[in-house]
Amino acid sequence: MEEATGKLEVITRYFADFSNQQINQFAELGRVYTAWNEKINVISRRDIDSLYEKHVLHSLAIAAIFKFSAGMNIIDIGTGGGFPGIPLAIFFPEVRFHLVDSIGKKLKVVNEVVNALQLKNVTTQHIRAEEIRNRQFDFVVSRAVAPLKDLWQWSKPLLNKERKMEAFKNGLICLKGGDLTQEIQESRLKPHSWEISALIKESFFSEKYLLYIPA
């Protein structure tokens, strides 16, 4: 636990005011992922030692801009190993997160992490985003899952219209990297965009972006 707590410094450098429970959850997160990644590879072997920077802190870039409020419902589509959903669920304990993925073995790891961290605000579902029916959420979050055009097509039916944040309408929030010029052009959308490197001063976040499309 002491080693994991030391690695948390890359998070606490940018985010403060965590409760003891949140600190313990973030620390335990590293231990559980490392153990399960030996059995089911949900995180690149070369990235597991950089888990807190490349996966946890990257996920929390969303929290640097969007201050979700208590009672909101967020869906993480194509959650993979649980990112960005699990770090955000720790960060926002009074917000409900629904994590979905089409690959069952990845959700097995997600469920083990959720149980180990005792995250009461997380549910999971083995399903493709486009197959979800009769459920709506305040925001959709996603990380490196699909082209923006597809993400938006999947997200639109999942977004309710009742606005719960003053600063932002309900919408899609996604983490992307690289040159997005062609992808954005092909989507015919005009997303709001933030350079993550302007928010988090770590070299890993060069050419990493946070995109937002309001419903």
What residues fall within each predicted segment?
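Active-site capping/gating segments
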Residues: 177-215
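Class I SAM-dependent transferase core
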Residues: 1-70, 75, 105-108, 112-122
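A generic alpha-to-beta junction signature in SAM-dependent methyltransferases
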Residues: 66, 159, 163-166
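A short, conserved alpha-helix within the catalytic core of class I
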Residues: 148-158
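Conserved beta-strand segments of alpha/beta enzyme cores
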Residues: 96, 121-123, 171, 192-195
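Conserved beta-strand signature within the Rossmann-like core of class I S-adenosyl-L-methionine
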Residues: 163-179
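Conserved SAM/SAH cofactor-binding pocket of Class I
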Residues: 60-142, 152
